Amino acid sequence: MSEEQRLNRARFRLAILKEMRAVHRQRQDTWGLKRDKLAERMGMDEARVSRILNGDEVLTIGLVAEFFHALEAHPTIRAELYEQIESCWRKWHAGIDAALGEKP
C-alpha cells in the first residue's frame, strides 16, 4: 500500500471518528445511553470516556473498535451508527472524485 493510500485510509478513519463523536453528542439522550453505561460496557472509567467523546484523547484503531463494539450492542444505536458511517463514506468518495475532476 502506498503512502498516499495509507494517508487516505487514516483520513477516512478520522472522519468516521469525528462523525461518531458528533452523533453521540447529539443523540446521547435519544439513545438513552449515558456515559456511565458506555464506560461500564467498555470497562473504562467515566472520565476517560468523556475525554474520548469530547476529543481530548488520542484515538487508536483499537479504541475505535471498542467503541463500535460497545455502541453496536445497543439496538437503537446500530442503525444510526451505520447510517453515519455510510454518510461519511459517501462524503469521502465525493471529495476524492472532486479532487480527481470526476463526476459522481
Which residues does each PLM region occupy?
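N-terminal flexible/basic segments that precede or flank functional cores
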Residues: 1-29, 88-104
